[in-house]
C-alpha cells in the first residue's frame, strides 16, 4: 500500500491512457479501410494478484475492460480488438522490479517449468494480427506457461 498518488497515476497513464491514445491514432485509418487489428497487452497477474504491484495489476485489469468495451465500439467498422496476458517475462526490462526469486517462483508456479521470453508471445500476437482471427474480438489470451488457468 506504499504507492504514491504520483506513481499510481504514472502507471495508469502509461498502461491505460496509452492504449486510448494509440487506438485513437490508428482508428481513422482502420475505419477508412473497414479493417484493422488492435492488440493490447495485459498481464496474467490480473488472475491472482501480485503483492506490492497494486497499481500495475489494476492497470492491466483495465486493459481487459478497455479491450472489451472498444471491441463493442469498433466492431461494426471491421476492427477487432483483443488482448494478450503474458506471465512474468524475462525480457531484461523488468530486472530492477523483479528480483531473481520472483522469476524462480513464477517458473515453479507454471505447468511448463521454464522462464517465459518475449519470443513465447510472438505466435499469439501474430495469430491475433492475422486473418485467422478475423472473427474473434474482445478476447483475452493468457500466455503464461499454465500458471493461471481460467
Roles of regions detected by a PLM:
Residues 4-9, 94, 106:
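Substrate-binding pocket helix/loop in short-chain dehydrogenase/reductase
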Residues 110-121, 132:
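A conserved structural motif in NAD(P)-dependent oxidoreductases
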Residues 23, 59, 67:
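Active-site helix of classical SDR
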Residues 48, 125-126, 137-150:
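Short C-terminal tail/terminal secondary-structure segment
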Residues 28, 72-76, 134:
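Alpha-helical segment proximal to the catalytic Tyr-Lys
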Residues 43:
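Residue(s) in the substrate-gating loop at a strand-loop-helix junction
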Residues 3, 49-57, 69:
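Active-site loop-to-helix junction immediately N-terminal to the catalytic Tyr of the SDR YXXXK motif
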Amino acid at each position: 500500500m506504499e504507492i504514491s498518488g504520483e506513481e499510481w497515476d504514472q502507471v495508469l497513464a502509461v498502461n491505460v491512457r496509452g492504449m486510448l491514445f494509440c487506438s485513437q491514432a490508428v482508428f481513422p485509418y482502420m475505419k477508412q479501410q473497414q479493417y484493422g487489428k488492435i492488440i493490447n497487452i495485459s498481464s496474467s497477474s490480473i488472475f491472482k494478484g501480485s503483492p506490492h504491484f497494486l497499481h500495475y495489476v489494476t492497470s492491466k485489469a483495465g486493459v481487459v475492460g478497455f479491450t472489451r468495451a472498444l471491441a463493442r465500439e469498433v466492431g461494426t467498422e471491421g476492427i477487432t480488438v483483443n488482448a494478450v496476458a503474458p506471465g512474468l517475462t524475462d525480457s531484461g526490462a523488468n530486472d530492477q522490479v523483479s528480483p531473481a526469486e520472483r522469476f524462480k517462483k513464477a517458473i515453479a508456479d507454471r505447468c511448463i517449468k521454464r522462464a517465459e521470453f518475449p519470443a513465447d508471445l510472438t505466435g499469439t500476437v501474430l495469430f491475433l494480427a492475422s486473418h485467422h482471427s478475423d472473427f474473434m474480438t474482445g478476447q483475452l489470451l493468457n500466455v503464461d506457461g499454465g500458471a493461471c488457468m481460467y
